Amino acid sequence: MNIPQDLKYTKTHEWVKIDGNKAKVGITDFAQYEITDVVHVELPEIGKQVKKAQPAAVVESVKSAFDIYSPLSGKILEVNDSVLRSPEVINQSPYENGYLFIIEFTDEKEIADLLEADSYKNLI
């Protein structure tokens, strides 16, 4: 399993890349492996306010649909349209081309609740 050291993680298998007051969000390599072949993605609307630990997106496989939870509270700044057109990119490149959305977070203290790579590795 690929678990990049420079990212933060959630217990629900989302990854977060912090950049100033913005955070890029996707699902982990472990999550995409468990979900198997991603066939459809529903992303939040740009400008939508999201709350930490609340559903923000949906990833569907041939087996089932999985809620993707926002790791931080804030406003959706950008969504990755390429995963809407080609959802399989989430399986192929979960940490790069397969990211889901970028959020402008509103509570920096919530970052402390995210897991470091080693803690996430122990979780899975």
Swiss-Prot record:
Function: The glycine cleavage system catalyzes the degradation of glycine. The H protein shuttles the methylamine group of glycine from the P protein to the T protein.
Key words, A-Z: Lipoyl
GO BP term, pick one: glycine decarboxylation via glycine cleavage system
Gene name tied to this protein: gcvH
Pfam family, one: GCV_H
Entries under InterPro entries matching the protein: 2-oxoA_DH_lipoyl-BS (IPR003016), Biotin_lipoyl (IPR000089), GCV_H (IPR002930), GCV_H/Fam206 (IPR033753), GCV_H_sub (IPR017453), Single_hybrid_motif (IPR011053)
Name of the protein in its database record: Glycine cleavage system H protein
Keyword GTP-binding among record annotations: no
Protein family according to the UniProt entry: Belongs to the GcvH family.
UniProt entry tagged with the keyword Nucleotide-binding: no
Quaternary structure (record): The glycine cleavage system is composed of four proteins: P, T, L and H.
PANTHER family per UniProt: GLYCINE CLEAVAGE SYSTEM H PROTEIN, GLYCINE CLEAVAGE SYSTEM H PROTEIN-RELATED
Ranges of residues in domain Lipoyl-binding: 22-104
Requisite cofactors: (R)-lipoate
Modified residues (N6-lipoyllysine): K63
GO CC aspect terms: cytosol; glycine cleavage complex
Cofactor binding note of this UniProt entry: Binds 1 lipoyl cofactor covalently.
